[in-house]
Amino acid sequence: MAAEQVEDYCISFVEMKFINNTLYFVAENDEDLESDHFGKLEPKLSIIRNLNDQVLFINQGNQPVFEDMPDSDCSDNAPQTIFIIYMYKDSLTRGLAVTISVQCKKMSTLSCENKIVSFKEMNPPDNIDNEESDIIFFQRSVPGHDDKIQFESSLYKGYFLACKKENDLFKLILKKQDDNRDKSVMFTVQNQN
């Protein structure tokens, strides 16, 4: 019995260019190549909690805050407590790329523009033609914690969504993670669908 030849998935380069101290390769046939981007996949409806079991919700000022809330109140306040987590196909392998949105009166999507966490009134786009975005976070499991999740900003490497107490409120912020044991950047995500 003869062995089957496996088709090579190689790229043939026909030219090299140096532009601004960066070497670029020109492919002979680039129709199968995909540019760096995020492509929207299916959403999941989820409740997000910090490690104090406080529920993330959108307050009247459209700000993301955490509050003690029984499950029955989560259901009663579903438009403010149920988040739509859209998963995105990422052309690079860096974790599960997601956006976090909420449908209250209008669709709003979480942003970390200028390292400030807020909701922008917008639908998550179907495609983002870039390697980073203020609305894309990498959802990852926390090593050693089976049910804990972290959300790292795609725009600010090493910065994570975190819970921080300010005055009497527990706010969602963006924080540089200095320590792997920092529990403020850990969350549980309870899928609803």
Swiss-Prot record:
Coiled coil: none
Keyword tags: Cytokine, Cytoplasm, Inflammatory response, Secreted
Cleavage (site feature) positions: D36, H37, D71, S72
Annotated InterPro entries: IL-18, IL-1_fam, IL1/FGF
Post-translational modification remark: The pro-IL-18 precursor is processed by CASP1, CASP4 or CASP5 to yield its mature, active form. The pro-IL-18 precursor features autoinhibitory interactions between the propeptide and the post-cleavage-site region, preventing recognition by the IL18R1 receptor. Processing by CASP1, CASP4 or CASP5 induces conformational changes to generate critical receptor-binding sites. The mature form is then secreted and released in the extracellular milieu by passing through the gasdermin-D (GSDMD) pore. In contrast, cleavage by CASP3 inactivates IL18.
A family per Pfam: IL1
GO biological process: one example: positive regulation of inflammatory response
Localization of this protein: Cytoplasm, Cytosol; Secreted
GO molecular function, one term: interleukin-18 receptor binding
Tagged with keyword Secreted: yes
Quaternary structure and partners: Forms a ternary complex with ligand-binding receptor subunit IL18R1 and signaling receptor subunit IL18RAP at the plasma membrane. Mature IL18 first binds to IL18R1 forming a low affinity binary complex, which then interacts with IL18RAP to form a high affinity ternary complex that signals inside the cell. Interacts with cargo receptor TMED10; the interaction mediates the translocation from the cytoplasm into the ERGIC (endoplasmic reticulum-Golgi intermediate compartment) and thereby secretion.
Its job: Pro-inflammatory cytokine primarily involved in epithelial barrier repair, polarized T-helper 1 (Th1) cell and natural killer (NK) cell immune responses. Upon binding to IL18R1 and IL18RAP, forms a signaling ternary complex which activates NF-kappa-B, triggering synthesis of inflammatory mediators. Synergizes with IL12/interleukin-12 to induce IFNG synthesis from T-helper 1 (Th1) cells and natural killer (NK) cells.
Protein name, as recorded: Interleukin-18
Organism: Bos taurus
